[in-house]
UniProtKB/Swiss-Prot annotation:
Belongs to the eukaryotic ribosomal protein eL21 family. GO terms for biological process: translation. This is Large ribosomal subunit protein eL21. GO terms for cellular component: ribonucleoprotein complex; ribosome. The gene is RPL21. InterPro entries: Ribosomal_eL21 (IPR001147), Ribosomal_eL21_CS (IPR018259), Ribosomal_eL21_sf (IPR036948), Translation_prot_SH3-like_sf (IPR008991). It holds the Pfam family Ribosomal_L21e. The lineage of its organism: Eukaryota, Fungi, Fungi incertae sedis, Microsporidia, Unikaryonidae. Keywords: Ribonucleoprotein, Ribosomal protein. Gene3D superfamilies: Ribosomal protein L21. PANTHER family: 60S RIBOSOMAL PROTEIN L21. GO terms for molecular function: structural constituent of ribosome.
């Protein structure tokens, strides 16, 4: 029989890096979170309070409520073939701001800047959707210095 403890099977999952053990730094507590922020849940095993279940370690969710020492995070969990929204309460030590939407945020800011420039110049801006790369272009091989080689198979010969 295996025990059904809350932290079972986390010997390596919750292990800290070399010389990174102990309490979280002050900067962790000074980080500001707002409703709508995307956060990565990364369990800090040195802090037992507000620790989420091992299932949520490494998952990304959205903050829907901010408390003085904790966050309420909503994320999707697959349950029997469908995705259910799970709402969990996690202390600040176990989360960090996610970088999952950095690229799209940059693209949005760049598009807004281009729209302002176009408006100031009085030019209509073309749609800035990303284009799919598509297949490679056709290439012609000249036969001047390239002798054609017949490609085929050799019959199987038993040596012994």
């Amino acid at each position: 029989m295996r025990s059904k403890g809350y932290r079972r099977g986390t010997r390596y999952l919750f292990s800290q890096d070399h010389r990174k053990h102990g309490v979280a730094h002050v900067s962790k507590y000074l980080e500001k979170y707002e409703i709508g922020d995307m956060v990565d849940i990364l369990v800090n095993p040195a802090m037992m309070k507000g620790m989420p279940h091992k299932y949520y370690h490494g998952r990304t969710g959205r903050v829907y409520d901010v408390k003085p020492r904790s966050l309420n995070v909503a994320l999707y969990k697959r349950v029997r073939g469908k995705y259910v929204i799970k709402k969990i309460i996690v202390r600040i030590e176990h989360v960090r701001k996610s970088r999952c939407s950095e690229e799209s945020q940059k693209r949005i800011l760049m598009a807004a800047e281009m729209a302002r420039d176009a408006e100031s110049r009085g030019v209509v801006l073309a749609p800035s959707k990303r284009k799919i790369e598509g297949p490679r272009k056709a290439v012609e091989v000249s036969l001047d210095n390239n002798q054609p080689i017949e490609v085929g198979y050799e019959p199987h010969v038993v040596i012994f």
